[in-house]
Amino acid sequence: MSDKKTSNQMWGGRFASGPAAIMEAINASISFDRKLYAQDIRGSIAHSEMLAQTGIISTADQEKIAHGLNTILKEIEAGSFEFSTRLEDIHMNVEARLADLIGSAAGRLHTARSRNDQVAVDLRLWVKDECFRVAEALKGLITALLARAEEHAATVMPGFTHMQAAQPVTFGHHCMAYVEMFARDLSRVRDAIERMDESPLGAAALAGTSFPIDRHRTAKALGFREPMRNSLDSVSDRDFALDFLAMAAICATHLSRLAEEIIIWSTPQFGFIRLSDSFSTGSSIMPQKKNPDAAELVRGKTGRVNGHLVGLLTVMKGMPLTYGKDMQEDKESVFDAAETLDLMLAAMTGMVSDMTVNAAAMKKAAGSGHATATDLADWLVRTLGLPFREAHHVTGRAVALAEEKKVSLEKLSLEDLQSINPGITADIFSVLAVQNSVKSRTSFGGTAPSEVRKQIRYWKKRLAKA
């Protein structure tokens, strides 16, 4: 395509001269909005079909338009299409090439349409498609976590608060916590799809059009539930993009938390897991190193995704109705966040699937830090009838004694414990073992292996219907 066809020829009837070079540079978006080519062509074909069906253009012109657009689609996908920055964006690049191919009939395509509703429908279609991709990726990650949870439903590990050993849990239970988080992310994706499932096409510049168009027809042709009900809203808001970015930011934050734990667990000091070579790198100077770079990059890229949400919120916060060129800044945020999230989900699914779990190291760590202290307090309440606050105090004294003797709680003698409360009997030792502590947590959603397996069965059924 020749640069002789400038943007000035598309909208420049009232201008005496073309834009300055710097204006063309700052105004052009083709370097990134070319990603919308498939959606742009899809929307244009649906629009042309509606124009013909309502008698606004002839069937002959519509057939030429559709044939030309399909030719352009093939050119772009083959890599032979010549994009021009002087034509600003994907819409005008496609329209200019269409004019090259079919002549004056191309000029009828933009009847009853503005670039304002055109870009709104293009981006909405793209984001909707991306939401479906994210949903599938999330299902893959949840499946990987469920497999790990099932494998390690009874594998004991320490549960932490403030990064201090708090109570014993199972690794399966820990994995299921992330299943719940990512399942909510999946729900957020679906909620976003539901809200964005309306077509802005036909709103034209902002006020609608005097042509007898059929917006319901184009909405259906493009796979939307219905057309948007207000033409001003149709072209002026980007909350569907913000919905996507908010979902992406929350999901990325969940991924980052899991990545942080993987990084910690894979250190020699913890030794809970070993990442596969496929998701690790080495050092250029230290030959012994095996670095958890995939997890670190997931953690690092979260800031990038979160930044895109804040960036677009900031763009939109001062926008009066309806359209302003500020909105051109929506696309790079969305495109980069989507690409980044796709990578993060794929990397995390791979790490979870391939990592080796060191159950022995987890079990050993689970007994440290007096992790069964709460079990001791609960036993005092159940067996001796102590108020919980008094039981908490007695247990605290037992912990202090254990630390003084440099032993774990279960290594204290019965005499030691009776020196704190004479009512304590030898039965206390059954609750101080970490395995028994875990088995006793049978409340709904608890860490007992029996309860973890119930939750695994529940989510497997839910996922099968998803």
Curated annotation (Swiss-Prot):
Tagged with keyword Cytoplasm: yes
Q: What is its EC number?
A: 4.3.2.1
- SUPFAM superfamilies according to UniProt: L-aspartase-like
The family classification in the record reads: Belongs to the lyase 1 family. Argininosuccinate lyase subfamily.
Protein name stated in the entry: Argininosuccinate lyase 1
Q: Name one GO molecular function term.
A: argininosuccinate lyase activity
The record, for NCBIfam families, names: argH
Q: Which gene encodes it?
A: argH1
